[in-house]
């Protein structure tokens, strides 16, 4: 994933491309399920809420075209889970994310 440099250096496009590329490779290799962490939000310092927005939008847009694939977001902290829940609710108020 991209290193955060203030948001004016194409980071969002790079992050979305990262998710799409992984999903495309998964399909090409016959995978049915993919699990993602919150890419670039650790040592690359991508702001969590912005990263969640990019990730969820890129993934859901991809899944609309390829519904045979299943994606799980792995949230390693309560803060990450909260960010993804908030962004999910902002983007898709009519549906709920699946929690295990």
Give the role of each language-model region.
Residues 3-100:
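Phosphate/ribose-phosphate-bearing ligand recognition and processing surfaces
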